Design a protein with these regions (language model features):
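Short, low-complexity intrinsically disordered segments enriched in small and basic residues
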Residues: 2, 6, 26-28, 32-35
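Intrinsic-disorder-associated, low-complexity terminal segments enriched in Asp/Asn/His/Tyr and depleted
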Residues: 3, 10-11, 15, 24
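Short, Lys/Arg-enriched N-terminal segments with co-localized hydrophobic residues
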Residues: 17, 29-42
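His/Asp/Glu-rich metal-coordinating catalytic cores
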Residues: 43-97, 106, 112-210
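Active-site recognition of the HExxH zinc-binding catalytic motif
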Residues: 100
């Protein structure tokens, strides 16, 4: 049985549904507002650096199967030339978001590359420019320190020292930088967007809204 609409029926899906199922509210709601079958992915954020100190900023974001690092910084105040491990499998990281160029936020990016990371590194244009200087300089320090320590080790019979990363690692990582403008909405992956906002800490520094 069809129900007569109390008002003229316009040529729209909702009006047609109301005309056909006007008295059956349950059916009407299901047809007009069908239930969502796709569940939203859970966003999980893990603090794996600078959670108990200022330096070594590194945060691990998981959204479904997507894995993103926010910063990948070097700890300072320790012997920064000692080999360090990236706390997540580098080859599984899909992208990096970088807040600014200070080494305690960016200094382990070349090590991330050396261990297998090949994804994009998003940061502001000014941060990209500074990283091209600072990460090369950091790589030079790593290689120089390793050479100096190995000369000492050779005399004392100690083990060979391997730098955190090389200039080649730094240069290759720099090729993966993706410059972004402030307040630009960046589609990282389907359903994951980011926006950089100016915070005034350093040229190019930003807070990141996800």
């Amino acid at each position: 049985m069809f129900y007569r609409a109390s008002k003229p029926v316009h040529n729209s899906i909702s009006h047609i549904i109301f005309a056909l199922f006007g008295k059956d509210r349950v059916i009407r709601q299901k047809l007009i507002r069908p239930e969502r079958t796709k569940k939203r992915s859970v966003m999980k954020l893990t603090f794996i650096g600078a959670d108990h100190e200022v330096t070594g900023s590194c945060h691990f974001l998981e959204v479904g199967d997507t894995k993103v690092l926010i910063d990948c910084g070097m700890e300072q105040g320790e012997d920064v030339f000692e080999n360090q491990e990236i706390p997540v499998p580098a080859s599984e990281v899909d992208a990096v978001l970088l807040t600014h160029a200070h080494i305690d936020h960016s200094g382990l990016l070349p090590l991330l590359y050396a261990k297998g990371f090949r994804g994009p590194v998003y940061s502001t244009t000014a941060t990209c420019d500074l990283c091209r200087i600072m990460l090369r300089d950091s790589a030079h320090i790593q290689e120089f320190e390793a050479e100096w320590r190995n000369r000492k080790a050779k005399r004392s019979g100690g083990p060979e020292y391997i730098p955190l990363y090389t200039m080649e690692d730094a240069v290759c990582l720099l090729e993966q930088l993706v410059p972004c403008d402030y307040n630009e909405i960046i589609e990282l992956f389907p359903g994951i967007r980011a926006r950089f906002s100016d915070v005034g800490h350093l040229l190019g520094s930003a807070s990141i809204e996800l």
